[in-house]
Amino acid sequence: MATSVGHRCLGLLHGVAPWRSSLHPCEITALSQSLQPLRKLPFRAFRTDARKIHTAPARTMFLLRPLPILLVTGGGYAGYRQYEKYRERELEKLGLEIPPKLAGHWEVALYKSVPTRLLSRAWGRLNQVELPHWLRRPVYSLYIWTFGVNMKEAAVEDLHHYRNLSEFFRRKLKPQARPVCGLHSVISPSDGRILNFGQVKNCEVEQVKGVTYSLESFLGPRMCTEDLPFPPAASCDSFKNQLVTREGNELYHCVIYLAPGDYHCFHSPTDWTVSHRRHFPGSLMSVNPGMARWIKELFCHNERVVLTGDWKHGFFSLTAVGATNVGSIRIYFDRDLHTNSPRHSKGSYNDFSFVTHTNREGVPMRKGEHLGEFNLGSTIVLIFEAPKDFNFQLKTGQKIRFGEALGSL
């Protein structure tokens, strides 16, 4: 209404002589008061024919705000990744094999630039904070519900017993919860899901189907049980041949992914002797099956602890691979091992020999014996030598529990 009154008034004023010669001062005051509300209206300009009589201050400057831009960009990328996963699932239902779509170098570099080591150390310290007694049940119950943890298998089922998250993650199981299979040569060292298994060919190991990593990059230069390095491998095949110590044997591998809800300890998969430990400081990227399918040589990028030695058929190794929030890898008999430490730089490795003048063999391990633990879910990689008639009794993607058979002769 105020706008229409203003236009009428302006129309009357158009082409009229100056106000002081035709209007009484009282009329001027009344007209001014009637136009006063127009100053508060959200319009940019009023025009009388071609003349502009009022212009509001323009506020069109665009302010760049990093956080909204990052949220929009990250959300769009996450949405795209979810669409790709949905598309892959639909194609798998149709029985179509989908070639893996690998991350580019810039994507891997961008991911590695995230301070996952620092974040994992912070997470580790947070896990050590003692929870109030009244808060333990709701916090642990939420975790149990989210990741499907079976507390009936725990040695201590009372949630109030666990003072902090770290103790809860590393909970022990009842002895009868995981019977160890005595009929097979190699058992699963942990709970988890089988990502891949089979024979090592051309010095390339499959982390998932169609995505490989270099055997030499993963294990590092060969070290023998006497802690003396072999000469550098002249070719990929010669490095593989260094690991195979007996004629007629082949090299095999098995990759087991531990989800956050799985039992976090790992055990000896067979009777063997550990003679050497190699620690690779590295990134702590996620190792879930989706990432393993997306990033080539993921396990070579991440921090890991390689235990090597011998079993009755020759070379045997177990590697614990770290992941996001899983910088802490503990080996029970190795007190000198400290993972995800700021003093360790990426791109190097640290060796330690368990063979000494007083112990010429190393550390003997029995099948099923406690070997180590993660602070959260991660990955175990077995690489070992065995006769050609060794058979895995597995399916890719199957769930497996510690103590169940992996394979036998």
Curated annotation (Swiss-Prot):
One of its GO terms (biological process) is protein autoprocessing. Residues 83-409 are mitochondrial intermembrane. One of its GO terms (molecular function) is phosphatidylserine decarboxylase activity. Pathway: Phospholipid metabolism; phosphatidylethanolamine biosynthesis. InterPro entries: PS_Dcarbxylase, PSD-B, PSD_type1_euk. It comes from the Eukaryota. It holds the Pfam family PS_Dcarbxylase. The modification Pyruvic acid (Ser) is found at S378. The record marks G377, S378 as: Cleavage (non-hydrolytic). Its cofactor is pyruvate. It is an enzyme of class 4 (lyase). Is synthesized initially as an inactive proenzyme. Formation of the active enzyme involves a self-maturation process in which the active site pyruvoyl group is generated from an internal serine residue via an autocatalytic post-translational modification. Two non-identical subunits are generated from the proenzyme in this reaction, and the pyruvate is formed at the N-terminus of the alpha chain, which is derived from the carboxyl end of the proenzyme. Belongs to the phosphatidylserine decarboxylase family. PSD-B subfamily. Eukaryotic type I sub-subfamily. PANTHER family: PHOSPHATIDYLSERINE DECARBOXYLASE, PHOSPHATIDYLSERINE DECARBOXYLASE PROENZYME, MITOCHONDRIAL. It is linked to Liberfarb syndrome: An autosomal recessive multisystem disorder affecting the eye, ear, bone, and brain development. Clinical features include early-onset retinal degeneration, congenital cataracts, sensorineural hearing loss, microcephaly, intellectual disability, white matter changes, mild facial dysmorphism, and skeletal dysplasia with platyspondyly, scoliosis and short stature. Heterodimer of a large membrane-associated beta subunit and a small pyruvoyl-containing alpha subunit. This is Phosphatidylserine decarboxylase proenzyme, mitochondrial. It comes from Homo sapiens. The lineage of its organism: Eukaryota, Metazoa, Chordata, Craniata, Vertebrata.
